[in-house]
Every structure is written in structure tokens, then in C-alpha cells.
Amino acid sequence: HPYVVIAPSYMVYSIDFDQFLHTHIESGADVTLLYHAVDNAKEAYLTCNVLGLNRQKGVESIEPNHGNKKNQYVYMDTCVMKTELFISLIKEAKNLSSMYTLADILNDKCETLDIRGVAHKGFFASITDFPSYYAANMALLNYKSAQELFHDNWPIYTRTNDSCPTQYFNTADVKNSVISNGLSLIHI
């Protein structure tokens, strides 16, 4: 395959990777990074990297979010590039240090490679600890947020099983919850 798309398992978002790849090819960039503009980077996304972008959406830096700015471009650890370039970057990172990440080597190459950013629109969450996991789940209780993530034309394939409906006892007090079937809810 001529191109590779790298995406993490701890970022929650929806994107058409075919369109992302097409945008990369049309731009002529060496590497295209996906980012999400946020206005709460002082409190959230503190374990994520942020991008420094120029006016043409060219990436000038990839640095840790130190929580010193409210508005940031959070790097979603998602990128596309040619397979040969990916392999050469990984080899170079390995030769430099066993602690080097792909983001580290890309940051080193910002001046020599054409690295561009593409903005992501819609629901986005970075799940790196229990508080961010909880916050993402609570955000998805909002119907608009859930619609941004789950699209009608993109079905979710899951394994179903037959179980009885959830049973709510008289003492149950349930608010802001998504409840699966097969449960018995009581309040003691």
C-alpha cells in the first residue's frame, strides 16, 4: 500500500479516512496531521500534544500541552503519509532514542518536511485517564454530541445478545444514564 494512516485507540471521534487520505494527496504534503481546535486546553487535554500552525495550516511545531493557553489545536495523534516515509521516520526515531515517539520525530522534521494540519469538526474526546473517560461518557449523554459521533449512514457493528429488559425497582433513582438491558436497578 502506498499510504499509511495512523490513528490511536484512545481518541474518540468519527472521520471518513478516505476523505482524509484524499485531502492529503490533493495537498501534496509529505505528512498530514489531524487536529481539533479546543477552547479548554488549560483544564483538559493536558496529556496531549498541541500543534503550532502557520496561516496556511502548515505545522510549525508539535509540543506537549502545558495548560498555559485556553485555545489550542490538539493533535489527535492521527496522520497520513507515504509508507516509505513512515518506515524511514520510525527507523530514524529508533536510532535517535528508544524514547522517541512518532510525534517527536515529526516535530524534528517540521522544518524539512511539508507537514500540514487538517481540522476535525464534530465530537472529539481524548480518553487518557478515569476523569477524561467519565467526561467523555457524560458528554455523550447530550443528544447533539452523540449525533456528531454516531451517524445514521455509518452503522456500528456490535454483537447482540438476548436478555431481559432492565428492571427498575421502586427505590431506583436514575438520572443522566445510558442503561443497557439485563440490569436490575435498585437504590439502597
Where do the model's predicted regions map?
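Short aromatic/hydrophobic "clamp" motif used to bind/position activated sugar donors
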Residues: 4
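Conserved core of the sugar-phosphate nucleotidyltransferase
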Residues: 14-84
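Short phosphate-binding loop-to-helix
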Residues: 1
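Glycine-/small-residue-rich active-site loops that bind phosphorylated ligands and cofactors
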Residues: 12-13, 125
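Left-handed beta-helix
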Residues: 84, 93-187
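Active-site acidic Asp-centered loop
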Residues: 7-8
